[in-house]
């Protein structure tokens, strides 16, 4: 039986802004929820007679990352700055994140490395990471950085306008 182009099972290598984000622990999840609006007619009562699409309610890729380097933490945490042997975190408010977004790529992993076949890669054209840090220190608890990449539609001109993601090689 044929497998999906992006593979049926297995981990992936996560690349954002041309940097490998780090190792994951648990499932990397892709969530797209399409929004719709009901169309009704008085003659049919409360029964909907059609649906109209209204874009996506949410577009997210969630990465439970672990064992991050300081450089990786700086890359995926908004307003974090790496200085010598530390990372400093600064408060920020009012910044537009679309302009800071970059391409996110999920590459299926085989033997601990990304598969070379770009036909199996999943590209998200414009994505920005939001880190939710809930770190526990315990005998059995591994520390995890939950990173949720918000995916935006391309606002460029031409054939990629509105494009959010694609499976296969990058657009030339």
Where are these regions (language model features)?
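Solvent-exposed edge beta-strands and adjacent loop segments
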Residues: 1-78, 126-144
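Mature extracellular/passenger domains of Gram-negative fimbrial/pilin and adhesin proteins
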Residues: 28-32, 118, 161
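Surface-exposed ligand/attachment interfaces on beta-rich extracellular proteins
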Residues: 42-49, 85-94, 172
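Beta-strand secondary-structure signal
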Residues: 60-64, 103-107, 146-150
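Charged, amphipathic alpha-helical segments
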Residues: 68-94
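Short, cysteine-centered beta-strand-loop-beta hairpins and adjacent loop/turn segments enriched
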Residues: 68-75, 114, 155-159
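Acidic, glycine-rich flexible loop segments
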Residues: 97-137
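Mixed-charge, glycine-accented linear interaction segment located at domain edges/termini
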Residues: 121-172
């Amino acid at each position: 039986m044929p497998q999906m182009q992006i593979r049926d099972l297995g981990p992936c290598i996560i690349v954002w802004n041309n940097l490998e984000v780090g190792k994951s622990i648990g499932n990397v999840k892709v969530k797209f929820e399409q929004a719709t609006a009901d169309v009704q007619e008085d003659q049919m009562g409360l029964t909907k007679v059609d649906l109209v699409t209204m874009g996506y309610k949410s577009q997210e890729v969630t990465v439970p990352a672990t064992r991050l380097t300081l450089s990786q933490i700086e890359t995926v945490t908004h307003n974090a700055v790496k200085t010598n042997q530390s990372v400093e975190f600064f408060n920020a408010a009012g910044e537009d994140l679309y302009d800071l977004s970059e391409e996110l790529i999920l590459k299926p992993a085989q033997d601990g490395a990304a598969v070379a076949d770009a036909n199996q890669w999943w590209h998200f054209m414009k994505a920005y990471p939001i880190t939710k840090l809930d770190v526990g220190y315990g005998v059995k608890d591994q520390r995890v950085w939950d990173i949720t990449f918000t995916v935006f539609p391309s606002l460029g001109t031409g054939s990629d306008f509105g494009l959010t993601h694609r499976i296969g090689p990058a657009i030339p």
